């Protein structure tokens, strides 16, 4: 019986390792009000995959555009792989194609064109052997909105701390 339990625990640990966060854009949640999210695939070359798995991706300045009916990821820095020569390495800031269904792309295109919203990369995560990018439809926050959100967050934190004390 102990052997079966060990196998289940090892399998659960393997699943947890296979579904992990690789990069997060925390600044985006502060600067934008995220209205809707979408999980997309991302078209990468081999050295980009190795760099992302090593945690060498920066989503902070990134944004997404819809051009020619395709979602494109711009200005996301993925560091060159250290063990590949210059010839086989990738351009760190190249434009990458995002993989999503046509209906989802058309829906986001209508929202971005109509309301003046923007598409922002929120996180890169590993799902099994696939690297997925979560993008968000965001509306820019003004300074007073950021302050109000920070105040609300602090009050929730204070209430939670008070509840734990009693």
From Swiss-Prot:
One of its GO terms (biological process) is trans-translation. CDD domains: SmpB. GO terms for cellular component: cytosol. GO terms for molecular function: RNA binding. Keywords: Cytoplasm, RNA-binding. InterPro entries: SmpB, SsrA-bd_prot, SsrA-bd_prot_CS. Residues 146-166 are annotated as: Disordered. Gene3D superfamilies: 2.40.280.10. It is found in: Cytoplasm. Its main location: cytoplasm. It holds the Pfam family SmpB. It comes from the Bacteria. The keyword Lipid biosynthesis does not apply. PANTHER family: SSRA-BINDING PROTEIN, TMRNA-BINDING COMPONENT OF TRANS-TRANSLATION TAGGING COMPLEX. Belongs to the SmpB family. Required for rescue of stalled ribosomes mediated by trans-translation. Binds to transfer-messenger RNA (tmRNA), required for stable association of tmRNA with ribosomes. tmRNA and SmpB together mimic tRNA shape, replacing the anticodon stem-loop with SmpB. tmRNA is encoded by the ssrA gene; the 2 termini fold to resemble tRNA(Ala) and it encodes a 'tag peptide', a short internal open reading frame. During trans-translation Ala-aminoacylated tmRNA acts like a tRNA, entering the A-site of stalled ribosomes, displacing the stalled mRNA. This is SsrA-binding protein.
